[in-house]
Regions:
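Rhodanese-like catalytic fold shared by cysteine-dependent sulfurtransferases
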Residues: 469-473, 480-481, 488-521, 530-569
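Gly/Ser-rich catalytic/binding loops embedded in alpha/beta enzyme cores
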Residues: 29-161, 179, 267, 271, ...
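Glycine-rich, small-residue loops and helix-cap segments
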Residues: 344-472
């Protein structure tokens, strides 16, 4: 772990709002004791990682006894978990230390069609590790960035469709979506009983496999786990070091990759796999994706699943309707950027049982076609590029609009809808952003998929191309930089959207952690302009010529057209 890197960047770049103030746990008593994180220094001094256990952070839609489980929503701010989620207890029983909770896209990105991934009304905006202008994807945003920045080696995310694979890929880490049913969902705020799963996200395949060993298994409270085959091999670590791509038959999906750079990377991947001894089969994918049926299924199951969860929760709101009402009454803080049309549509599905059955039939048909596609081509796995590069954060039109400006491709949808294991391993880069390589296999082939990922990971040592970006200590890139030079305590009262925090007295020691160019445009602000003026003179003495003092936070907000975001407290 790179604790020194975390200390340098935790508040300064506001990357993840990773461990929210009221989630902090001490190592000696990881469930009972809270810490006062009023200032950055007191947080670092008081908070220690366990020296002899595997430190891990948990996405904040998963129960930890005595801690809030919020799904990033202010509506659930007081939802204190009665018990540990099944997977959390298994982690504690297997020498893991729960270091804290990670921010996520609110309601696991299931609130609005125009949502901004990585943003939640409770936790604020999580940023991509490479650039503050860019989105970390979601919904397991904080889990991905926590690993990418080096705070922990592994985290737990959840996925309904893309919520592990996407943030893992765009932040340059390994992410594993297991076969649905391999990991219990008990104690997790749900979207869909058909597609939900939790899974590990880590710095390499080995730690991901180790974590999956710990959390996998039968849970009598989750009927999906009863589908685990009786002879299933849970020893995911067993053959990782000896695994090889030699002789493996891998199918490259020739889907619509209209982007030249994506095709170039796919061709490079084919060459690398073949040089490693794999047999690569180019597949003409004619499957039709049932978008409307899948989304209806998710909306129908969300209402039922959420209300089942709330029934036994400490949260006083027990229905989706009450959640919606709370959001409406607190729209200024809950919905400053986008609405809740998905929640409203979910509410309307309640009695549409026949349409729900049609949706089940359609998605099951797609699953059968996908499994048949793998089997008929005698494949060990599908392989391909996980998804396109990160897109810019856009609060005006959300991800939907922002993704129009970047190459858009992905291969995780069929795995999600079919409940198949999906592993992404960081390998390439595009436009300075990571691109993962995905392996997708048959149900319960999780061990084989991990072995393929470990074998590909080793190919990095033999690969002399420059298409892989190492995430650790990567300078933050942006067209311009906004620096808040106030004190730590002042920042807790609110911070300008997209700004980083460096107290003016620390500017000399810390400026090179947020920019690698003395030509970059830098804007400074504070409470009234005085400290920003002193910081401006210091930076110009250091050779930074494009520096401007914007005065107070309110003046900076008006000049730069940036909102003032209040941090969780």
């Amino acid at each position: 772990m790179k604790l020194d890197y975390w200390q340098e960047n935790f508040f300064k770049v506001n990357l993840i709002l990773l461990i929210l103030i009221f989630f902090l746990m001490s190592c000696s008593d990881q469930i009972e004791q809270e810490h006062d994180a009023a200032t950055f220094n007191s947080l670092i001094e008081e908070y220690d990682f366990h020296s002899s256990k595997i430190n891990i952070v948990i996405k904040d839609n998963i129960d930890i006894k005595g801690r809030p489980t919020t799904a990033g929503s202010l509506a659930l701010e007081g939802n204190i978990a009665k018990d540990n989620a099944y997977l959390v207890q298994k982690l504690l029983d297997n020498n893991f230390h729960i270091a804290g909770k990670a921010n996520l896209s609110e309601w696991a990105n299931f609130r609005s069609y125009y949502s901004v991934s990585g943003w939640s009304s409770l936790g604020g905006q999580t940023y991509n590790i490479v650039g503050l202008d860019f989105n970390p994807c979601g919904s397991s945003s904080g889990s991905a960035v926590a690993v990418a920045v080096g705070i922990v080696d592994v985290a737990i995310g959840t996925e309904t469709n893309g919520s592990i694979s996407c943030p893992s890929s765009v932040n340059g880490i390994v992410g594993m979506k297991p076969t649905v049913g391999l990991v219990s969902r008990t104690g997790i705020i749900p979207i869909s009983v058909s597609q939900d799963t939790a899974g590990p996200m880590g710095k390499n395949v080995t730690i991901v496999a180790r974590t999956l060993e710990a959390i996998a298994g039968y849970d009598p409270k989750d009927s999906a786990t009863a589908e685990i085959p009786q002879n299933f091999d849970f020893n995911f670590l067993e053959n990782l070091k000896q695994s090889s791509l030699k002789g493996k038959r891998l199918g490259v999906l020739q889907s619509d990759l209209s982007d030249r750079h994506a095709n170039d990377l796919l061709n490079k991947l084919q060459t690398i796999l073949e040089q490693a001894g794999a047999e690569v089969v180019l597949l003409n994918d004619q499957r039709a994706y049932p978008y409307e049926d899948e989304y209806f299924l998710l909306k129908y199951e969300f209402k039922t699943g959420l209300e089942d969860y709330l029934l036994n929760a400490t949260e006083s709101k027990k229905t989706l309707e009450e959640i919606i009402y709370f959001n409406e009454q607190n729209a200024e803080t809950v919905m400053p950027f986008f609405g809740q049309e998905i929640l409203l549509e979910s509410l309307e599905t309640e009695n549409l049982i026949e349409q729900y059955q049609r949706a089940i039939d359609a998605t099951q048909k797609t699953k059968a076609e996908t499994i048949a596609f793998l089997k008929s081509n005698k494949l060990d796995a599908f392989v391909g590029l996980t998804r396109g590069p990160a897109w810019k954060i856009n609060y005006e039109g959300g991800d939907d609009k922002a993704m129009d400006d970047v190459p858009s491709f992905s291969m995780g949808g069929f795995a999600a809808i079919s409940g198949l294991p999906h592993l992404t391993v960081p390998f390439f880069q595009m436009e300075q952003f990571p691109i993962g390589v995905s392996f997708i296999g048959l149900p319960w082939s999780d061990k084989r998929i991990l072995e393929l990922g470990a074998a590909l990971e080793r190919e990095l040592t033999n690969y002399d191309g420059k298409d892989f970006i190492a995430m650790e200590n990567t300078p933050i890139k942006s067209s311009f930089l906004i620096i808040d030079v106030r004190s730590d305590a002042e920042v807790l009262e609110g911070q300008l959207q997209d700004s980083v925090h460096i107290e003016w007295t620390q500017i000399v020691d810390s400026i090179d952690t947020v920019t690698s160019s003395k030509d970059q445009q830098i804007y400074l602000y504070c409470r009234s302009g005085g400290r920003a003026g002193r910081a401006e003179l210091i930076l110009k003495d250091l050779g930074y010529q494009n520096v401007e003092n914007l005065g107070s936070i309110e003046q900076a907000s008006n000049i730069l057209d940036r909102k003032i975001l209040k941090l969780a407290n």
